[in-house]
């Protein structure tokens, strides 16, 4: 890369919109550049600002000793603005040391990403169910009244955008829309229109929040209400059980918010679907990280989402939230074709500092599953129901199949990625049906990961999780303070006897897996990521609490690490 010569040329200076409300005007100036590389057909065209140019000048002076630049401070309003920027471009194009500098490389990457991202946002908004500028008021609080560009995507998600660069146009096809920044999203699942009047409608969400949206005209109000009602019908039709898998790759992010004092961040991504999650590696000191990390989950609910949460790692305090996106499974092609999605990161609330987008590659395989759970089924019934309805297939109030699974897995403790590598969805469905109908199953050693998938599925489909809904808040509150062993033991003692007996079976088994982590790569931390969300979950899963999601893993890890002391006490 060092031998490649970069030529940068100023293509002009033009007016742009400043940071005003959507309906207001106002102009500032931007500089347009074109970058070419020797021996390459790649050409970059991007726009930047006076402040970005001055930041580049400052960083070049810090990075390159005794550098001689033609200008020390750039003013885009100066009478010599075009001449000055051309002199700077000539200096950079004729100085290989500047072209190879980290400051210049980062400048090109950041400013080009910002321009590409703006174009992406324009296309993202344009290709939607409906969009328009509305006044949004939350819970009838006038202080929350904000003018937002509202967009419904995938017939499932309501996005709202504000501007980082303003404009005077409300036309969706206007280039001014490129200046928008995502300010939040709401899922239309379990939402309903509770009131409609002249030029306004009220939307009630699943967590009982109300939003009043005021439209410019009554006709537009009618279009919004009709579209939302159609979306609600679509969601209802998409609600059914499946046997499937979602696979994909978190490719990269761009233009992330700086969370550290050095102007960078240390981002990582947590991906979640149903009661499963995966954490990517951390990419240190980057606002444009390349992850290229694969994920896969088993799926039982077609109406669900795959969530992506971006965090900034911090060694001395809790990770900082950097944004979220959600992909509805019903959006994805039913034939398993892979699609690539650029999605804008969304904040949780107005206090979050969030910017940037994330690129995901994703594919979804599924087949419809049975709708109702038989009272005699092993999968989908509570532990108490299994013990009551099928006592002949239980031992110590534990389903015999769990003993059989564990006996089989203990013969494969050195299997790399046990419980982490995805099994074949068709095989998992076959195993599930076999368990539901036969008292004894024959295990195939060549399908270890399929049996591991069926084992995980049993705990995900429990109507009452192993650690119980009643103790969710107590366990989360304990973890928020700092997990202590004795209070944890006292909480565990309150579990129903069948839950305790299953835990007594699992903990020694997990200890054996962790003891062989050098070969199977499944230490206590990885086990907690796989099983924690299944063992401990909130009753209403329609809203994902990000901080609690991390605490769930911490609790599970603490239980696994202290299993010997816990077993002695229960």
From Swiss-Prot:
One of its GO terms (molecular function) is metal ion binding. One of its GO terms (biological process) is small GTPase-mediated signal transduction. Keywords: Calcium, Cytoplasm, GTPase activation, Metal-binding. Its cofactor is Ca(2+). Residues 381-567 form the Rho-GAP domain. The record marks 420 as: Arginine finger. Residues 224-343 form the C2 domain. Ca(2+) 1 binds at residues 260, 266, 312, 314. Ca(2+) 2 binds at residues 260, 312, 314, 320. It holds the Pfam family C2. It comes from the Eukaryota. Its main location: cytoplasm. Residues 127-233 form the PH domain. It is found in: Cytoplasm. GO terms for cellular component: cytoplasm; plasma membrane. Coiled coil: none annotated. Rho GTPase-activating protein involved in the signal transduction pathway. This is Rho GTPase-activating protein gacEE. It comes from Dictyostelium discoideum (Social amoeba). The gene is gacEE.
